[in-house]
Amino acid sequence: VGFKAGVKDYKLTYYTPDYETKDTDILAAFRVTPQPGVPPEEAGAAVAAESSTGTWTTVWTDGLTSLDRYKGRCYHIESVAGEENQYIAYVAYPLDLFEEGSVTNMFTSIVGNVFGFKALRALRLEDLRIPPAYTKTFQGPPHGIQVERDKLNKYGRPLLGCTIKPKLGLSAKNYGRAVYECLRGGLDFTKDDENVNSQPFMRWRDRFLFCAEAIYKAQAETGEIKGHYLNATAGTCEEMIKRAVFARELGVPIVMHDYLTGGFTANTSLAHYCRDNGLLLHIHRAMHAVIDRQKNHGMHFRVLAKALRLSGGDHIHAGTVVGKLEGEREITLGFVVLLRDDFVEKDRSRGIYFTQDWVSIPGVLPVASGGIHVWHMPALTEIFGDDSVLQFGGGTLGHPWGNAPGAVANRVALEACVRARNEGRDLAREGNEIIREASKWSLELAAACEVWKEIKFDFEAMDTL
């Protein structure tokens, strides 16, 4: 007897409300907006089918395998409160659908062709549950939070950084000079901007050399370990690794990668190199808003953050809550705990759809960067806590007296906030007063307070629950 050819509804095969999820399943929560006339069960089943074993018609080769073993299943659908014709579809994928240790392969299935599917008006991946059985196939961050603190010998406070500006156009020597001034003033790190790679005005090798000189000079003067995120992102993986090798030969502590524009395969390769060679890895998320900013289509940043923790990175930019870039407080804190903690409970108030157990994968330091200055320091210290990197680009280099005084102002403000917190003061309520008190003892901080006293970026956050 021949097989039964023809087209049948996805929901007959892929919508299984009685399915009990397994501990080894990868679980996904999709925000589905079906086309008019398409029932939610059919839309959810279509997502499960098209992101796993299904295609638009029955094919005779289905008989050569066990679809029951390999198919994705839509096991639950709930409507989204306050939205018409929008649903959260929960899909379970058997572990065997995915190559071990490959974020690239996981995403090619789960967020591949299905996002262009005609029966859906829009589709957004809100969250993923990565089971320990799959997590253990990844190396994860090259070093993690504790190893980084031990390497740098810095404890009990957030780390301070600064992106060198103007981001494009400086010569390598002037760039190195700016790095030196910031590190000498009291910052822990300076940073290449994400789009600084190897342009005609400043080739990568020259920049690496002058930055290394700046690091060593600042370390000698301050007695503290310093670093500069040398951006190894390049047009090919081979060139990227070549740059990381040169950084290692210079003896610097950290390199950097733009993981979304560079791609997950390149990122994982670099993370492996960094662990093998004792380099920390700073991750910039350039391009994330293309993927995550629309509420009804794309992929939420918490998924990109989880993917980065698997692929590997020791720092990642995670919004500021208070600065110039997008980030609502509870949602930002949601992916901050997903980056740092070993075990994260489901918490829908923070947008966390699944309990996530990271087993032995190290944590990632969230980086707050973008439009922040000394008046934000109390809020940042309270929101992000000690295990974070606070990055002030304009908030350092924009100081009226120059880079080193700008760095001094930030370091004094941070030390004042940490001390006040440790003494039991309420940073949220007394923040401005704490900064004012500290500025009496630091002319640099007083000047910074004066310049930025009125600056605010007040817009509604797009990324709401």
Curated annotation (Swiss-Prot):
Catalytic residues in the record: 165, 284
GO cellular component, one term: chloroplast
Documented EC number(s): 4.1.1.39
Annotated site location: Transition state stabilizer: 324
Residues involved in substrate binding: 113, 163, 167, 285, 317, 369
Catalytic activity: 2 (2R)-3-phosphoglycerate + 2 H(+) = D-ribulose 1,5-bisphosphate + CO2 + H2O; D-ribulose 1,5-bisphosphate + O2 = 2-phosphoglycolate + (2R)-3-phosphoglycerate + 2 H(+)
Post-translational modification: The disulfide bond which can form in the large chain dimeric partners within the hexadecamer appears to be associated with oxidative stress and protein turnover.
Cofactor(s) it depends on: Mg(2+)
InterPro entries: RuBisCO (IPR033966), RuBisCo_large_chain_AS (IPR020878), RuBisCO_lsu_C (IPR000685), RuBisCO_lsu_C_sf (IPR036376), RuBisCO_lsu_fd_N (IPR017443), RuBisCO_lsu_N_sf (IPR036422), RuBisCO_lsuI (IPR020888)
SUPFAM superfamilies: RuBisCo, C-terminal domain, RuBisCO, large subunit, small (N-terminal) domain
GO biological process, one term: photorespiration
Keyword Magnesium appears in the UniProt entry: yes
Gene3D superfamilies, A to Z: Ribulose bisphosphate carboxylase, large subunit, C-terminal domain, RuBisCO large subunit, N-terminal domain
Binding note for cofactor: Binds 1 Mg(2+) ion per subunit.
Main localization (coarse): plastid
GO molecular function terms noted in the UniProt entry: magnesium ion binding; monooxygenase activity; ribulose-bisphosphate carboxylase activity
Subunit details: Heterohexadecamer of 8 large chains and 8 small chains; disulfide-linked. The disulfide link is formed within the large subunit homodimers.
Family according to the record: Belongs to the RuBisCO large chain family. Type I subfamily.
Biological function: RuBisCO catalyzes two reactions: the carboxylation of D-ribulose 1,5-bisphosphate, the primary event in carbon dioxide fixation, as well as the oxidative fragmentation of the pentose substrate in the photorespiration process. Both reactions occur simultaneously and in competition at the same active site.
Protein name (record): Ribulose bisphosphate carboxylase large chain
